[in-house]
Regions:
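Soluble, non-transmembrane domains of envelope/secretory-pathway proteins that act on or interact
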Residues: 1-86
Length: 86
């Protein structure tokens, strides 16, 4: 695995997520590969969840705006992507 082998998967950095008309707030499946033990997920620097490595976390984005999504593992490795919600 490359150095710092923890990687967010399924979300591209810079992606724009659009709400479907008057539909429900968009939800993203937050998932990472290469982590050890427990993964800590942060949204704009605030912790939103802890899950065992290999498990996904569902996150709803109720408000439009820019979001920074970060994942960290117990070994101190991390990955980060930025998305926009419209």
């Amino acid at each position: 695995a490359p150095e710092g082998g923890l990687r967010i998967v399924g979300i591209s950095n810079g992606a724009t997520i659009r709400r479907a008309g008057n539909g429900p707030a968009p939800e993203l499946r937050l998932e990472a590969r290469g982590g050890q033990d427990e993964l800590i997920w942060l949204l704009n620097g605030r912790q939103i969840g802890r899950v065992p490595a290999g498990r996904a976390l569902q996150q709803r984005f109720s408000d439009a705006g820019r979001y920074q999504i970060t994942v960290m593992d117990d070994a101190g490795r991390y990955d980060r992507v930025e998305i926009s919600v419209r």
